[in-house]
Amino acid sequence: MTKIKIVTDSSVTIEPELVKQLDITIVPLSVMIDNVVYSDADLKEEGKFLQLMQESKNLPKTSQPPVGVFAEIFEDLCKDGGQILAIHMSHALSGTVEAARQGASLSTADVIVVDSSFTDQALKFQVVEAAKLAQEGKDMEAILSHVEEVKNHTELYIGVSTLENLVKGGRIGRVTGLLSSLLNIRVVMQMKDHELQPMVKGRGTKTFKKWLDELITSLSERAVAEIGISYSGSDDWAKEMKESLQAYVEKPISVLETGSIIQTHTGENAWAILIRYHS
């Protein structure tokens, strides 16, 4: 039976042991901080990137992996035959998925590239489910069908404590209906249809707490498969959210620091709640 290999990009927020256990290949993006280019793979140590960003004169810039890197990785993974399923962050956030498609067309490997519509742990949900099915020996059609199912039952919510990074990074245009002049404002957004859509905004910590209470009310009526919480900066609020949410899902909630790619755009003291519902 043909082995299917799973590839994703480093905007995914995932436990290193899962990557190893499920044999997932992660293609790193790069980040430029004050004219020094770092591979995202070298910035995974807790708090390392945030410190570099705080000390930098300018906002870091992220770059998608080069097309040639994708082509080489795909070629290498298929030396012994087999197929590749590459699942990447939304095209609205980065040109990574397009670079993967171009890399696939340059290689002789049998590659299918999927836009996850998400990033962070919401991307992880699709990648992990695909990798589990690949290890079970399922065919590409079955895996793609399940990945689509996971995508359609996933929600991504993000809270930021400042809009400064989103504005400077040019991402504010993709956040509909927010005035970029309101920089120091707390905003909760949902990523839906490749767009960040504001849900609530306000100036104090109550903004986040009130929204969380509303989310909890809605969760009590739904069958939740898993929840992930990601954060930038202090993990205090992330832990508080975990305590409030764990009762609504059987599987332990994973609380993880998000990577440099996401932190560049969200700034410090940002968080995300990623929810996958049962189909």
Curated annotation (Swiss-Prot):
Key words, A-Z: Lipid-binding
Top-rank taxon: Bacteria
UniProt feature coiled coil, ranges: none
Pfam families: DegV
Residues the entry annotates as binding hexadecanoate: T62, S94
GO molecular function: lipid binding
The DegV domain, residue ranges: 4-277
InterPro entries the UniProt entry points to: DegV (IPR003797), DegV_C (IPR043168), DegV_domain_contain (IPR050270)
Function field: May bind long-chain fatty acids, such as palmitate, and may play a role in lipid transport or fatty acid metabolism.
Protein name as annotated: DegV domain-containing protein spr1019
Organism (species): Streptococcus pneumoniae (strain ATCC BAA-255 / R6)
